[in-house]
């Protein structure tokens, strides 16, 4: 049975969180477009910025992302997802942190038919 387009987006989100938890940068990279942009409270991050940040954390923290998807809308080759996300960050040395909040993500379907993260407005704050 094939997945609906919404199901494919949900699967991508699950894969992203699993790969992030495992420190699997190659899988995460494959889930982003080359021109991905992350809008964060600290400013704009492009692909190279995200990769550098991911590499700095890999092996130094344990991550656990808990999504609460509120809405997914698919319009042709673009999909928008509103997600209430909670991320538990446990440094190997230091105090654990929890960040939570709204995330609005835009995905684009490539010529290969695969969905990839294209724009991400991440409003997580420490809780």
Predicted stretch roles:
Residues 2-4, 10-31:
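Short acidic-aromatic low-complexity motifs
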Residues 72-79, 108-114:
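A short, structured loop/turn motif at beta-sheet edges
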Residues 87-91, 107:
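Beta-strand elements of well-folded, non-transmembrane domains
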Residues 100-127:
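Short beta-strand edge/turn micro-motifs at domain boundaries
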Residues 32, 85-87, 121-124:
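Short beta-strand segments enriched in hydrophobic/aromatic residues
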């Amino acid at each position: 049975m094939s997945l609906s387009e919404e199901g494919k987006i949900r699967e991508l989100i699950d894969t992203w969180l699993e790969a992030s938890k495992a420190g699997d940068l190659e899988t995460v990279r494959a889930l982003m477009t080359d021109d991905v942009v992350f809008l964060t409270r600290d400013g704009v991050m492009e692909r190279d910025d995200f990769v550098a940040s991911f590499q700095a954390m890999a092996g130094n923290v344990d991550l656990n992302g808990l999504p609460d998807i509120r809405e997914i809308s698919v319009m042709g080759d673009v999909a928008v997802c509103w997600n209430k996300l909670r991320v538990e960050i446990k440094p190997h040395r230091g105090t654990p942190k929890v960040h939570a909040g709204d995330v609005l993500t835009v995905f684009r379907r490539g010529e290969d038919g695969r969905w990839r993260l294209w724009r991400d407005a991440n409003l997580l704050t420490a809780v």
